[in-house]
């Protein structure tokens, strides 16, 4: 019944921790001869389902503002992630040489999906336009990568490891002083936020295509013969 109070409150992780603590306490009591059986043994460990806290635009804006305290490339990475809706590994792999015909060409590392995002793409509710974000990246980057901290010993080409985005996001999140749940939003949640915002402003079909979730029907929309493998947005 004691553990049920935590489980009913949706705090399965805490319930699991308390079960472990109680089991250790009763095990010590058995050793000392105070009791003969461990009452925790018959109980089942609560199933822990990690539910990531959804990132909302208001919270994103707070984290984005706090990100200005970090290296200049990171807030740009946040803007790029929100305006393009791409994954961490795709954000860190974007290059200036992949920009031509007024589009940013992206080959998603996870799925192999190839999309061409127009530089004119904008997300008014967030005050972002892809072309503007790209130009700001040019002012900061020292190489071909849009997001770069420059040539370093552990990065001779100037690229940023995807985990670097995750770590900097955690730092910015802490700078906000906001109290989050046990499973606070991560950098990856920016992609989900982008999907929801584009769904509201441009429709579900566009949002799905931007994220790379396409059907055979939508893949018929290509650029030209030379770039027919890229999905035109």
Please name every model-derived segment.
Residues 30-38, 135-140:
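Proline-centered turn/helix-capping motifs that create local helix->coil transitions or kinks
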Residues 68-70, 74, 84, 140-142, ...:
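Short, basic (Lys/Arg/His-rich) helix/loop patches that form interaction surfaces
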């Amino acid at each position: 019944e004691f553990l049920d109070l935590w489980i009913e409150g949706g705090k399965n992780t805490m319930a699991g921790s308390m079960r472990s603590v109680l089991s250790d306490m009763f095990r010590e009591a058995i050793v000392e001869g105070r009791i003969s059986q461990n009452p925790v043994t018959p109980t089942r460990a609560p199933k822990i389902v990690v539910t990531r806290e959804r990132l909302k635009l208001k919270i994103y804006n707070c984290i984005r503002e706090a990100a200005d305290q970090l290296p200049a490339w990171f807030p740009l990475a946040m803007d790029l992630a929100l305006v393009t809706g791409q994954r961490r590994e795709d954000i860190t792999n974007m290059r200036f040489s992949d920009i031509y015909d007024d589009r940013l060409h992206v080959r998603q590392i996870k799925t192999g999906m190839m999309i061409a995002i127009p530089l004119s793409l904008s997300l008014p509710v967030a005050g972002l336009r892809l072309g503007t974000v790209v130009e700001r990246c040019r002012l900061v980057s020292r190489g071909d990568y849009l997001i770069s901290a420059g040539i370093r010993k552990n990065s001779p080409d100037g690229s940023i490891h995807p985990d670097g985005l995750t770590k900097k996001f955690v730092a910015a999140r802490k700078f906000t002083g906001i109290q989050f749940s046990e499973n606070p939003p991560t950098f990856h949640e920016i992609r989900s936020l982008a999907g929801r915002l584009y769904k509201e402003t441009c429709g579900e079909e566009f949002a799905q295509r931007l994220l790379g979730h396409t059907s055979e029907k939508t893949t018929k929309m290509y650029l030209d013969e030379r770039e027919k493998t890229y999905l035109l947005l």
